[in-house]
Amino acid sequence: MGHSRPKYNSAVSTFCWAVANDEPFTVNDRGTELELLYIDDLVEGMFDLLEGREQHCEFNGVETVLKEDGRYCCVPVTHKVTLGEIVDLLEEFKAQPTTLMMPKMPNGSFAKKLYSLYLTYLPADKFKYALKMNADNRGSFTELVHTADCGQVSVNISHPGVTKGQHWHN
């Protein structure tokens, strides 16, 4: 999974391009599972090989089994996801400017890698979006982004002599 040509050699790139550009696309079976390797993980695996730190494996059918004395070199970081999971994440990314909600994207996660790819297809004019500023006689408050597990990022401006806040949100 990396930057490739939509509508040619990658369903993931096709979906990213279509969602980012408001183009129609078809998913024939949301339950179809893919095993994906992100380009950065492949490059890291190649550097490991060049530096003598490669991973070895054997194969049990199509399953990779890491084995120190395995006959094959492999990149152990792949992601098994369904087409439905991919499309659902892309729709969450697309909705972010409206909902301000960022999906969970832990380091190394498929979601974070997919988001990086999605952004490469996002037209420049979609990188900016209107924010709602709530203003009153005390100042203003503008929410920038929400997360499910890390709170929110916002800008709070108080006029001189005004104290705001002094409370917590769950």
Where are these regions (language model features)?
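A short glycine-rich, His/Asp/Glu-containing loop-to-beta-strand
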Residues: 127-170
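Residue-level signal for pocket-adjacent positions within structured domains
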Residues: 22, 29, 70, 136-139
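NAD(P)-dependent short-chain dehydrogenase/reductase
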Residues: 1-35, 39-53
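Mid/C-terminal beta-alpha module of Rossmann-like enzyme folds, strongest
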Residues: 41, 48-135
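Residue-level detector of flexible, active-site-proximal loop/helix-junction positions
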Residues: 32-34, 79, 148
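Residues that form generic nucleotide/phosphate-binding pockets
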Residues: 18, 89, 93, 144
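Active-site donor-binding loop signature of nucleotide-sugar glycosyltransferases
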Residues: 29, 77, 160
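Short secondary-structure junctions and interdomain/linker hinges
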Residues: 26, 93, 97, 148-151
